[in-house]
């Protein structure tokens, strides 16, 4: 990746093969998330895992992922600590439709002082209506969408606008949390909404 000018690396285990198209693919568990981060960190220091020198060393800015809303919640913070120790510099979070859980997660990171070592980047998803909310709730591992979030959009006379306003509220709340330094925005709308969000967020 470094040879092609790619310096930002987000290291993650990923979903189980049963969540993809090739459900009978072989699972590979040689490395977990923190171990993969440690491999990248070692390479960036100019060494292979064997200790042999790597010259020139790749320039890598290494990140990790975590789900702030999935139990067990205390374990999630412990995993972040392991990833920071392994060398992660940014933490991209799974989309959370539970502001209270996201806030508790971020405060837990700050209480351990990890926010001084890693940038927290929550995910925000721009959608046009209720269908993506139901899809994520039913089909995407690790995502739990509260019924009140679904109902607010579904019962609106203008689902597209209500979905946007709700997303804006989630984004504003996320940016107000301690340790948060930005947002990862996924845009399923493919219109001018992303520009509107950036403008509304200031």
Task: List each language-model region with its residue ranges.
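Active-site pocket-lining/capping segments in soluble small-molecule metabolic enzymes
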Residues: 14, 27-55, 65-70, 112-170, ...
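Conserved, mostly hydrophobic/aromatic
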Residues: 1, 83, 87, 122, ...
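Short, well-ordered secondary-structure micro-motifs
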Residues: 21-22, 73-75, 103-104, 131-140, ...
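Short, acidic/polar
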Residues: 72-83, 164-174
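C-terminal/domain-terminus segments
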Residues: 177, 185-202
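Catalytic beta/alpha-barrel core
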Residues: 89-98, 182-187
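Short, well-ordered coil/turn segments that N-cap beta-strands
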Residues: 5-7, 57-60, 88-89, 114-118, ...
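A generic, well-ordered mixed alpha/beta core segment in the N-terminal half of proteins
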Residues: 2-17
